[in-house]
From Swiss-Prot:
One of its GO terms (biological process) is UTP biosynthetic process. ATP binds at K9, F57, R85, T91, R102, N112. This is Nucleoside diphosphate kinase. GO terms for cellular component: cytoplasm. Belongs to the NDK family. CDD domains: NDPk_I (cd04413). The keyword Chaperone does not apply.
Amino acid sequence: MERTFAIIKPDAVERNIIGKILEKVETAGFRIVGMKKILLSKCEAEGFYYVHKERPFFNDLCSFMSRSPVVVMVLERENAINTWREVMGATNPANAEAGTIRKDFGLSIEENSVHGSDSPESAAYEIPYFFSQLELL
């Protein structure tokens, strides 16, 4: 079994569509092994997205991710990372396939409702950023 990290972003939490996204998570065969709703500080968002610190969108991204609560999750199933990326859809909702989370719920390239690890290495960094081993069941 493989694990991946996922975030339901502020735009989705603000629109009260957490349940609709969780339905897609479960329909895709994921087991939720950790989940919590948190409010990131700007500093925590900057630490999480440090890999993008030189990119022009970094400050806007960190402000967006800390503007209101998010739901952070650890998802488990075979081929979890690639499957979650397929369920999310393309980063830009306009380019996402029908039935994906971003096509169904995303508003823009930034407000695209969800985040997911893009590799085993990023999952290995992202999961312990938010969860201790004791929190993963």
